[in-house]
Amino acid sequence: MNKTKSEHIKQQALDLFTRLQFLLQKHDTIEPYQYVLDILETGISKTKHNQQTPERQARVVYNKIASQALVDKLHFTAEENKVLAAINELAHSQKGWGEFNMLDTTNTWPSQ
């Protein structure tokens, strides 16, 4: 993958994470969404510092948010769901071997 494409994907991930963060902060009460906001903040930091590929980070962020939404019975707006769908799409954007190699991803920052 050339540098321009990888930088574009990185910026796309950062834009999606930031957009969802902004949308969640618009709720009247953000306390139920605080853990999701923390997940997004960690995802932004790790993506900015190249600690994980944007696709893998998108997968981690999406999976953690989906799990938290199930546990806390969170409800997202239509616009938030669109951003979540875009994050999920980015998480699965690698084709063929790239997608296969992501099956063994173990670095999902469990200590967070």
UniProtKB/Swiss-Prot annotation:
Gene3D superfamilies: 1.20.1440.140. InterPro entries: Bact_Immunity_Domain_sf. One of its GO terms (biological process) is bacteriocin immunity. Keywords: Bacteriocin immunity, Plasmid. Imparts immunity to pediocin PA-1/ACH to naturally sensitive host strains. This is Pediocin PA-1 immunity protein. It comes from Pediococcus acidilactici.
